[in-house]
Amino acid sequence: LKGGQVMAESMGVNTFRSKMAVFIIASVFASISGWLYAHNQTFINPTPFSLQMGIDYLFMALLGGVGSVWGAILGSGIFTMMRQWLQDYLPIIFGSQGQYETIVFGLLIVALMQKAPTGLWPMLMKIMPKNLKPKDRHIQITDTTEKLAVHAMPSKGEVVLAAKEVTKKFGGLVANNKMSLQVHAGEILALIGPNGAGKSTMFNQLSGVDTPTSGEVIFKGEKINGQLSRLIASKGLSRTFQHVKILPEMSVLENVAIGAHLRGSKGVFASLLHLDRAEENVLLNEAKYQLERVGLGDYLYSEAGSLALGQQRILEIARALCSDPCLLLLDEPAAGLRLKEKQA
């Protein structure tokens, strides 16, 4: 969810439910650790649970990086040693007692947010020799004959999407003024205009990312004004974005598999109990197929952030196709693509 909430919602992910599930699971682990602490110590001292200690724990996570277990271990180790060192030597330097380490840690947090927002562990991984880096555990994909659920496609020529006098105002600025259009099944319709004309704003209203000030948006005969983008996605509408929205630290395959989220049925508990592996394999096979379809089959396990801008746009198209859409909205899909990539 980090850094991709709008994209995740547009792919059908219920971000609120996912955040709530993560919060509850984290709370369970925190409760168990607190119980074990009390059982081991046979005495409860409020100091380890104070606000100051909470800030210290947060800084440990920020220092090492919250994306990995090794980052948390590195951050806690560095923080503990630094605090002890600062408490011993800062009073000698300044000649008096005081909470000088708090000032130093505050400055370090500012520097960390500027220079290493993801923590020190990801930085170490980039400069570490390949033979010392932890080996990537690629997701194993096995061939399967199982098929995913598909949307019922409209008949050729049928009106799939209609916008009727759609207007969007941002204060005194009118971004879209009574815009109307119709998209028929089997038709390619282009929305052309200069920069700042409101094309992406129109796309946001058609896909549920934004709500029109006035007018109607009708998809497959149903008015979808004000509906959440994930609900519209479940009806068969998928899209790409003007500014590429990917999860750069995840693999290309994992990014594209997000598009198939709605085509799976397993939930959080099935995932915790590892009962979703068969379905996950089917979803990953679909993601692999779409990547091969758009010419990115050689980059399955590469980090999405390492791709060129043009390849990232193609990745977005593969992700949108993974949802088996009835209608595909492509927002400036050729921007950043070379001639051969456009032709392909």
Enumerate the predicted regions with their spans.
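Transmembrane alpha-helical segments in multi-pass inner-membrane proteins
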Residues: 19-109, 115
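Hydrophobic/aromatic residues within transmembrane alpha-helices
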Residues: 7-8, 78, 120
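Glycine/proline-centered hinge or cleavage motifs at structural transition points of membrane proteins
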Residues: 8, 12-13, 71
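Glycine-rich phosphate-binding loops of nucleotide-dependent enzymes
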Residues: 156-344
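ABC-family P-loop ATPase nucleotide-binding domain
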Residues: 121-167
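Hydrophobic alpha-helical membrane-spanning segments
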Residues: 111-120, 124
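Juxtamembrane/interface helices at transmembrane-helix boundaries
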Residues: 1-7
